[in-house]
Amino acid sequence: VTDLKATRFELDGAVATIWLHRPHRHNAWTGRMHTELRWILAELEADPAVRVVVVTGTPPAFSVGGDSQALAGHVERGSYDTGVPVDARTPGYGLDARLDAELSALWGLRFPVIAAVNGACAGVALALACFCDLRFAAAGAKLTTAAPKLGLPAEYGLSWILPRLVGPTHAADLLLSGRVVTAAEAPYGLFNAVLPDPEALIAHVQDYARALASTVGPAAVAATKRQLVADLLRHDPAASVRESLRRMDAAMGTAEYAEGVAALRERRPPRF
């Protein structure tokens, strides 16, 4: 990717913000957008200065999901094509083979990814938000799984992730009906917080992201994210305890831990 046409991104210190950026189509999802998103994430993953990534949409939408022109093309072909080239970047791949597929690979990234759902969010865009580590939304943002009203099954792992966020009963409602709900009406567990409007949302998310980037150790965040993912994929509490003890033992020999303890004892903010 040498010329971003469907996305854009900016760096502000240790926080990167990515916009899904096709405002003339309400940021409708295309293979080009997906490819660009993967390229940006791969570039950010390679930059050790980046500690937090925010994903949002160019107003007024987050993303209305699959572009209708692309959907019509699937009808003509009679099959599905993601539109992503086979040699596209694969950020987040390699941590665990069970994550190495499109959006679930977000969990393999070293930094937290925060979804700021500022407006309409449908289909694959909802899946993108769900696979982010944290999710915040504007109260009036409209959400839908969309697929059943197109005659399609659940897409991009929504049948796996939604029950884990909101429970099987609420997930079944959203996945089977495809009905539209606002973020304010969404089942508990989908969002970390719902803000009154898009402006308040972006301000809140940027404050949260800056705090996350500056007040906690980046190695600790990366390790904790890996613990969360590992424990979600297994049913073995004893293994989780053993893994946490191993990670704590390793962390206590690092400069990051020494700084954290020094800051605590000196009653000052840590300088990570």
Predicted regions and their residues:
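Conserved CoA-thioester-binding segment of acyl-CoA-metabolizing enzymes
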Residues: 1-58
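C-terminal long alpha-helix characteristic of the crotonase
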Residues: 23, 136-141, 191-242, 255, ...
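Glycine- (often His-adjacent) and acidic-residue-rich active-site loop
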Residues: 57-102, 150, 235
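A general structural signal for well-ordered alpha-helical segments in protein cores
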Residues: 68, 99, 159, 168-171, ...
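CoA-thioester-processing core
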Residues: 102-108, 116, 122-175, 204-208
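Acidic, divalent-metal-coordinating active-site segment for phosphoryl/phosphodiester hydrolysis
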Residues: 178-184
